[in-house]
Amino acid sequence: MPEDIFQGLEMFGLSSYEIKVYKTLLIKGPQNSTDIVKNSGIPQPRVYDIFNNLVRKGLIESSQIGKKKIFRAVPVKNALSHHITEMNAFLDELDKVVREETKNSSVKTPYIWLIENSEKILERMKELITEAKYEVILSLRKENLEELLKILNNEARRGITIALVTFPDTGEDLIARLNPNIVIKKRDGIASEVLIADRSKGILNAENSSKTNYGLYFEEDEIIHILNYYFYHTIWWPSFYITDFTNSNSRKISTAWLTCEAVSSYKTKGMRVTAKLRLKMGDEEKDMTGEISQISVVPGLRHTFYLKSRSGRISVGGKTARFENARLLYGVLNAK
């Protein structure tokens, strides 16, 4: 059997463990959790996280037979064809928008800076973290996490939402030193280090073939949008939670997909979520409060949440907000 063909599922956001489980169920048919662990070789403590992720992604289904829960794979074409259709629709829409927006606009030089050497990259990361007013979204390897640990803990105590993705080089002892209010996920494989603060400034930390570190610093809105998209699909989505949003009942936010993740965490625990938001509706900015009644997520296309206020129910999205009534600028979530 050509093993490499299954690794191609990584492009759909599956981790290596998720691929092993999905492959096992595709090849061997429906099984209970004990048999899946035995046949796939995944660690027992991770099994239910992986099942939940695969169910959420529409790749497996479960049913109760007696006292046992049985899992089965959704056929490949059924499970993945809608992702391909949605991505093609998104690309068509994006291409159309780019052509329309650039038709009559003057060319601007993007605000992009090259940062050379690890020390300067860390200094700029520290600046962005301490200057944040609402949220910091980032992925870090062990070495830089150790350097930024104190600052991240301080900002979490200050009420800034910190959403962190770690990699396999980070052990439980280091994770245990993080403030419990920090949202932590772990990715099975190493990826780029990214930092986005308040959805307005960002850093991409890279390493070239000669192992000389360099970083790219952005303040250009369109490039931040692309970096955010890359972070969600390549780093955040394939990762699993260690600590979710529910350790704190109040979260500052400025990113639509992070808001949807937080609301999902709260509602999974049976909590009611209210919000005080600054929104952009057309050319006007408005303050609105209400209850977030629902979220709607189509990976690669939209992250929408619905705010029920005295004036009615409105849909809220991210930067483009092409399917929603309003665009999120910033705000605070409260859950109870």
Regions found by a protein language model. Name each.
Residues 210-271, 325-326, 331-335:
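Signature of lipid phosphatidyltransferase scaffolds
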Residues 85, 108-109, 145-148, 154-158, ...:
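Contiguous mid-protein beta-loop-alpha structural module that forms a pocket-lining wall or clamp
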Residues 65, 74, 141, 167, ...:
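Surface loops and adjacent helix of pleckstrin homology
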Residues 77, 81-86, 90-164, 327-330, ...:
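PLD-like (HKD) phosphodiesterase/transphosphatidyltransferase domain
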Residues 127-133, 177-178, 196-197, 266-272:
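Flexible, charged surface loops at secondary-structure boundaries
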Residues 253-336:
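N-terminal accessory interaction module
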Residues 1-80:
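Basic, Lys/Arg-rich alpha-helical nucleic-acid-recognition elements, primarily the DNA-binding modules
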Residues 92-109, 122, 183-185, 191-192, ...:
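Inter-domain helical "communication" segments and dimerization helices
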